Swiss-Prot record:
Lipid bilayer topology: Peripheral membrane protein
Residue ranges annotated for the ABC transporter domain, each copy included: 13-249, 260-503
Known role: Part of the ABC transporter complex RbsABC involved in ribose import. Responsible for energy coupling to the transport system.
Annotated binding of ATP, by residue: G45, E46, N47, G48, A49, G50, K51, S52
Entry EC number(s): 7.5.2.7
Gene responsible for this protein: rbsA
The protein's name in its UniProt record: Ribose import ATP-binding protein RbsA
Enzyme class, broadest EC rank: translocase
InterPro entries: AAA+_ATPase, ABC_carbohydrate_import_ATPase, ABC_transporter-like_ATP-bd, ABC_transporter-like_CS, P-loop_NTPase
Reaction it catalyzes: D-ribose(out) + ATP + H2O = D-ribose(in) + ADP + phosphate + H(+)
Major localization listed first in the record, in broad terms: membrane
Molecular function in Gene Ontology: ABC-type D-ribose transporter activity; ATP binding; ATP hydrolysis activity
Taxonomic path: Bacteria, Pseudomonadati, Pseudomonadota, Alphaproteobacteria, Rhodobacterales
Entry's family note: Belongs to the ABC transporter superfamily. Ribose importer (TC 3.A.1.2.1) family.
Length: 511
């Protein structure tokens, strides 16, 4: 038990000058983070601030390019998840990494089950120890129950019991309340207090300010992959934390636009989904860029997938040019002039293994075929026209799309859907993971599309992008529209407050 006897003012884990670079992106730049025994440290920052990369470094999934990690003052190298586990670091993710077809006890002790003297798994000892761990955290379910029989909250308890089973000194909780009910969240808070009393150092990642200020003892703020500030949560307020999160300069100058809005092209009313969103309604005009902002779990991407027919809402009406349309599939959406550029280009956007030109022309084969036969020359011409419009950088259009950079893959996806001649284009995180030059090119092209009368919906987690590109912004929180913001009200602080459910600052409340 010597792991837990450190003084409360001596960090269990220290990360110092940690740097991590991916192709074209510096994810972490000289960041530091200290975790203390018996205390909760909230790691705070916008989407893309470097929180997830930090967690992956601490859990041995990524290795830093520079800097030092110390545990109880001694430098360590965490090359693998096993190294992190052996060092007493465990993570409980928003989506628990457990196995539905195994029992509770098997999930708790997978990889380190007690053994008999003959080397066989000692099932009696495993269930006995599992029962003790579950009792310790107030989990009432049976150790022999299959995980598939449990709800999300109880699966979290299994993950926590697993962390305790390896005598973890550091417990990382990454958005642990995202899928929990109010009652389940309260139970999780009680469990956090139990872990604190046991001397665990807890890294708590959340976008919800109310829970940060309720359970955290310390805070650390990252912004754009860099350390901003840390300290005691009792020494700051929500206003100060918001300013630390968003107080950065815009990366580049966004294109100037003189929005000339046309008639209403899309109307959404009463959209609802059993688990993702409810009460959604908005309109969109030709030539308009409508931004959607929100935090993790807000339901933005899920709403866009419903608009495009990937999923079906349980209720709601879609009108296009004033006429009610029923969209049951992506084909229905495309036929009605709605296209969707997804966030996950590799899985949903491009077809790896096919050449660039075929990726661009896939949804438009009717335009490049005659009597059921493809006309290769027409297919190449269509692909070349849109590739040139987007300044697609490729050695040849017949090369595998998988060989392109992220930015150029994004251009292929946009070209593919523009070739269908849509009325509405939905861009989900259009510049995520691409370099600054490609970002600027995508922004210029978005402005050009709007200028030509195309209606654009942009989902983005980057506040400068949302403000710099949008005519209006709809902020979503927990599956509902929290606010619609435009004009002088469109500020970083306003967006963060609405997204996190924070009341306006006193000076901004009208008299």
């Amino acid at each position: 038990m010597s792991k837990h006897t450190l003084s409360a003012d001596v960090p269990v884990v220290s990360m110092d000058a940690i740097t991590k670079t991916f192709p074209g992106v510096k994810a972490l730049d000289q960041v530091r983070l200290d975790l203390y025994p018996g205390q909760v440290t909230a790691l705070v920052g916008e989407n893309g601030a470097g929180k997830s990369t930090t967690v992956k470094i601490l859990t041995g999934i990524y290795q830093p390019d520079g800097g030092t990690i110390r545990i109880a003052g001694a430098p360590v190298i965490l090359n693998t998840p096993n190294d992190a586990s052996a060092a007493g670091i465990t993570a409980i993710h928003q989506e628990t990494v457990l196995f539905d077809e195994l029992t509770v006890a098997e999930n708790i002790f997978i990889g380190h089950a007690p053994r008999t003297k003959w080397g066989l798994i000692d099932k009696a000892a495993m269930h006995r120890k599992a029962r003790g761990l579950l009792d310790e955290i107030g989990a009432p379910f049976d150790t022999g129950a299959y995980l598939r029989e449990l709800g999300i909250a109880n699966k979290h308890l299994v993950a926590i019991a697993r962390a305790l089973s390896v005598d973890a000194r550091v417990v990382i909780m990454d958005e642990p309340t995202a899928a929990l009910s109010h009652k389940e969240i309260e139970e999780l808070y009680e469990l956090v207090e139990t872990l604190k009393a046991q001397g665990k150092a807890i890294l708590f990642i959340s976008h919800k300010f109310d829970e940060i200020f309720r359970i955290a003892d310390r805070y650390t703020v990252f912004r754009d992959g860099a350390f901003v500030s840390d300290g005691l949560i009792s020494d700051i307020d929500q206003d100060a934390l918001v300013k630390m999160m968003v107080g950065r300069a815009v990366d580049h100058i966004f294109p100037e636009r003189q929005a000339a809005l046309g008639e209403e092209v899309l109307q959404v009313a009463g959209y609802a989904h059993p688990t993702e969103f409810a009460g959604i309604g908005f309109t969109l005009k030709r030539g308009e860029i409508l931004g959607f902002y929100g935090l993790v779990g807000a339901g933005r991407s899920e709403l866009m997938q419903a608009l495009f027919g990937i999923t079906r809402p349980s209720k709601g009406v879609t009108k296009i040019n004033g006429d009610i349309r029923v969209i049951r599939s992506p084909a229905d959406a495309v036929n009605n002039g709605i296209v969707y550029v997804p966030e996950d280009r590799g899985k949903q956007g491009v077809v790896i293994g096919l050449p660039i030109f075929q990726n661009i022309t896939l949804p438009s084969l009717g335009r490049t075929s005659q009597s059921g036969f493809l006309r290769m020359a027409e297919e190449f011409k269509l692909a070349r026209d849109y590739a040139e419009r987007l300044d697609l950088r490729a050695a040849a259009l017949d090369q595998d799309v998988g060989n392109l950079s992220g930015g150029n893959q994004q251009k292929v996806v946009i070209a593919k859907w523009l070739a269908t001649q849509p009325q509405v284009i939905i861009l989900d995180e259009p510049t995520k993971g691409i370099d600054i030059g490609s970002k600027a090119a995508v922004h210029e092209f978005m402005a050009e599309l709007a200028g030509q009368g195309l209606a654009v919906i942009m989902v983005s987690s980057e506040i400068p992008e949302v403000i710099g590109m949008s005519d209006r912004v709809i902020v979503m929180r927990e599956g509902r529209i929290a606010a619609e913001v435009q004009g002088e009200d469109l500020t970083p602080e306003t967006l963060v407050r609405h997204a996190a459910g924070i009341a306006p600052a006193p000076e901004s409340i009208p008299a």
